[in-house]
């Protein structure tokens, strides 16, 4: 689904940057355990075609790097990425000033909210941002 959206936005080269937030298999209760994390499968599927940045408030940067992902601060991830993906429900991600962060991101932008942490209506203010997630058309 992500590749399809990016292709429709003409984002198909290795120049396309994806920012993945949440490497632990769950955000709450907080853990640094990445075993069986769906994020790892996602990265495996995307790494060949795109440049991947990542963030997790608990997982050490070294663990993120082991998966061929570049660790980055949240603000920098938003400013530098064509696609932003939230992969777990950590409280850090629930409390972001999402409108400000999206406003600063390159356009067009794909925002994938796998946990539906944010109301889709927030994104109505941004005609060049596509909001999607699991079970969202």
Where does each model-flagged region fall?
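Structural/interface elements that position substrates and couple domains in central-metabolism enzymes
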Residues: 1-137
